């Protein structure tokens, strides 16, 4: 390769890397309100487009959640809250297994919750000034038909210290925090039987099939 060709390829590489970095920066600086709308639009449009497939196999909701919702969820932050003070005493291998299983459990929980969706309208609150806040709650109204009171959900978002990316770490509905409820359900097993047993039992719960309530 001669000097001219080398300079040409160097210029192309510089352009590609610059474009990549600009894209990453744009993603990191994207408002959580914008991300919330993006996630909701993709999630519910895919649910609507795949109704026949979902009715035939409700577990397909897990695939939709995995593809459309989990990329917006900070599983490591939420999972570390479940482990609490045990985090530092676990091995890298144990943590890897735990976070994988924890992600599958959250996937199952969200997919099961979405069996209650039946073409309701989703209304996300108007964007507020973020300021220097690294944590924010975003209210989402699920508008019901026939004048039934809307279902209020609050999605808790956190801005990563290093990445600068906003991600969800908890959802609150009817005054119940999914994260706190998860901690409450599993902390006893973690305290008494250790993380390996916790992982095994979480795997059992995560493998539960998605079912529609009759």
Swiss-Prot record:
Asked if the keyword Signal belongs to this entry, the reply reads: yes
Q: Where in the cell is it found?
A: Periplasm
In its keyword annotation, does this UniProt entry include Acetylation? no
Question: Where does the UniProt annotation place the signal sequence?
Answer: 1-28
Q: What does this protein do?
A: Involved in a phospholipid transport pathway that maintains lipid asymmetry in the outer membrane by retrograde trafficking of phospholipids from the outer membrane to the inner membrane. May transfer phospholipid across the periplasmic space and deliver it to the MlaFEDB complex at the inner membrane.
Which terms are listed as keywords in the entry?
Periplasm, Signal
The record's comment on protein family reads: Belongs to the MlaC/ttg2D family.
* Gene that encodes the chain: mlaC
Query: Mind telling me which GO cellular component terms the entry cites?
Result: periplasmic space
Protein name in the entry: Intermembrane phospholipid transport system binding protein MlaC
Cystine pairs: none
Q: Which domain of life is it from?
A: Bacteria
What Pfam families does the record point to?
A: MlaC
InterPro entries per record: MlaC/ttg2D, Tgt2/MlaC_sf
């Amino acid at each position: 390769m001669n000097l001219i060709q080398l300079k040409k390829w160097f210029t192309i590489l510089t352009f590609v890397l610059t474009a990549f970095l600009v894209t990453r920066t744009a993603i990191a600086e994207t408002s959580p309100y914008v991300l919330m709308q993006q996630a909701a639009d993709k999630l519910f449009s895919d649910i609507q487009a795949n109704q026949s497939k979902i009715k035939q196999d409700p577990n397909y909701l897990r695939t939709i959640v995995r593809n459309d919702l989990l990329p917006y969820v900070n599983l490591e932050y939420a999972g570390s809250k479940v482990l609490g003070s045990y985090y530092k005493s676990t091995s890298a291998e144990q943590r890897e297994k735990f976070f994988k299983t924890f992600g599958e459990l959250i996937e199952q929980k969200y997919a099961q919750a979405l069996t209650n969706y039946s073409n309701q309208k989703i209304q996300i609150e108007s964007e507020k000034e973020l300021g220097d806040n690294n944590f924010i709650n975003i209210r989402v109204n699920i508008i019901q038909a026939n004048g039934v009171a809307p279902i209020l959900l609050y999605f808790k978002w956190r801005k990563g210290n290093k990445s600068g990316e906003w991600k969800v770490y908890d959802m609150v509905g009817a005054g119940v925090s999914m994260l706190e409820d998860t901690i409450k359900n599993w902390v006893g097993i973690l305290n008494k039987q250790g993380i390996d047993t916790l992982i095994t039992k979480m795997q059992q719960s995560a493998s539960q099939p998605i079912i529609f309530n009759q």
